[in-house]
Swiss-Prot record:
Protein name: Small ribosomal subunit protein uS2
Keyword Ribonucleoprotein in annotation: yes
Organism: Paramagnetospirillum magneticum (strain ATCC 700264 / AMB-1)
Pfam families: Ribosomal_S2
Domain of life: Bacteria
Family annotation (Gene3D superfamilies): Glucose-6-phosphate isomerase like protein, domain 1, Helix hairpin bin
Length: 266
């Protein structure tokens, strides 16, 4: 396996080169713009291509070292694609709303994740059957709310090693928190964005669904290439890694080991 390949033609067909109306531009993006067409800024794909490849290499290197990648995209065009792409490569995502402190207050977020796991277990085991319908409804709604906010990171087990972000204006808080903690950020920067604070900027359209799908497909492919490299380096069976490995969470492993030890021996 190798890093996914792409061509400038593919980027053009996906609409990656279309920026926003010239009235909405950010002057800090001037060096990444090719020109203006019909009142729309055109992004310079001659720069986007190598910058996208560099970002993919960075993501690949993170997973090759056993690191975690967090996909972030909460706008409606990106939400489903971000979740699907992260799941496809065994990584993590935030696609509903970025909660303040999601990175910088990880201890509190971890407590909420622990609560979500408890509710998952209770619902799966039928432990709520003895409660009144009202009590069951309250707990079900609590679970849905937590799952919507934290379901994509409940198995992350710690802070991510790199973020991949669609729309830095929409996800400004995620960028700020990552910068504060020194976590690298890969991000799509449209003509109305501020590239400051982005470790691996990728000039491109952050609104068109086809463009978003293209970025996410390439990043998930880079993740999988890194995972495969890690497995190969460790002497594992690459052919057995068709399904991206899901990271084990220590408390879950400990619980499973305890159950196995308590089980009657055949």
């Amino acid at each position: 396996m190798a890093l996914p390949t792409f061509t400038m033609r593919q980027l053009v067909e996906a609409g990656v080169h279309f920026g926003h109306n010239t009235r909405r531009w950010n002057p800090k993006m001037a060096s990444y713009l090719f020109g203006i067409r019909n009142g729309i800024h055109i992004i310079d794909l001659q720069q986007s291509v190598p910058m996208l490849h560099r970002a993919m290499q960075a993501v690949r290197d993170v997973t090759a070292g056993g690191g975690r990648v967090l996909f972030v995209g909460t706008k409606h065009q990106a939400s489903d694609v971000v979740a699907e792409s992260a799941k496809r490569c065994g990584q993590y995502f935030v696609n509903h709303r970025w909660l303040g402190g999601m990175l910088t207050n990880w201890k509190t977020i971890s407590n909420s994740i622990r609560r979500l796991r408890e509710l998952d277990e209770q619902l799966a085991s039928g432990a709520l059957a003895g409660l009144t319908k009202k009590e069951q409804l309250v707990l079900s709604r609590e679970k849905e709310k937590l799952d919507r906010a934290l379901g994509g990171i409940k198995d992350m087990g710690g802070l991510p090693d790199i973020l991949f972000i669609i729309d830095t204006n929409k996800e400004a808080l995620a960028v700020q928190e990552a910068n504060k903690l020194g976590i690298p950020v890969v991000a799509i920067i449209d003509s109305n964005c501020d590239p400051a604070g982005i470790t691996y900027p990728i000039p491109g359209n952050d609104d068109a669904i086809r463009a978003i799908q293209t970025y996410c497909d390439l990043m998930s492919g880079a993740v999988l290439d890194g995972i495969q490299a890690e497995i190969t380096r460790g002497g594992g069976d690459v052919g057995a890694a068709a399904e991206a490995p899901v990271e084990q969470i220590p408390e879950v492993v400990a619980e499973a080991a305890a159950e196995e030890a308590a089980a009657p021996q055949a």
